[in-house]
């Protein structure tokens, strides 16, 4: 979604690296190199022609110990979080703590919220139509604004997963 300049909800299980790059071989080749770099493997055999469903299986075999985020996405994420949260002095650990401790959600949610902050705060148009952003794109200036953006990202992830979430009450659990 990041390299192809599309929203996650615009990618289908039958998409391939070719359809995501509109058949432009240089973009496809770059995407394949980025996938390999992200996973920390020399190459991902069969990735070029695989549907995303099949690619997920290939990736799980090629890099069974992969944990989000790898070399490629960590750089993009670091840059985006700096531009969104830098003025508020909020670092990635603060976001992790808010999702894990305040929302009381697991590590998978943390990774998904970070991905939403990367993907859903991009300005501009999707290559498949519509806006890229589902969340505000402007930098936050303080921690209350940061909390509001993080909370909105949690809600976007919940919507994508098709589940309801709510901030736990002071004495309760999620």
Where are the regions that the model predicts?
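4′-phosphopantetheine-dependent carrier domains
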Residues: 1-174
């Amino acid at each position: 979604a990041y390299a192809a300049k599309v929203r996650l909800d615009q990618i289908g299980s039958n998409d391939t690296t070719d359809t995501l790059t509109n058949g432009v071989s240089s973009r496809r080749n770059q995407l394949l190199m980025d996938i390999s770099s992200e996973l920390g493997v020399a190459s991902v055999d069969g990735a070029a022609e695989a549907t995303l469903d099949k690619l997920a299986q290939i990736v799980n075999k090629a890099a069974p110990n992969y944990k989000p985020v790898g070399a490629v996405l960590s750089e993009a994420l670091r840059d985006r979080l700096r531009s969104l949260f830098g003025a508020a002095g909020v670092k990635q650990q603060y976001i992790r703590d808010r999702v894990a401790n305040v929302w009381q959600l697991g590590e998978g949610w943390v990774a998904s919220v970070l991905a939403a902050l990367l993907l859903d705060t991009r300005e501009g148009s999707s290559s498949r139509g519509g806006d890229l952003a589902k969340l505000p794109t402007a930098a936050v200036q303080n921690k209350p604004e940061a909390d509001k953006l993080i909370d909105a990202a949690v809600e976007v992830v919940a919507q994508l997963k098709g589940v309801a979430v709510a901030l736990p009450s002071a004495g309760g659990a999620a």
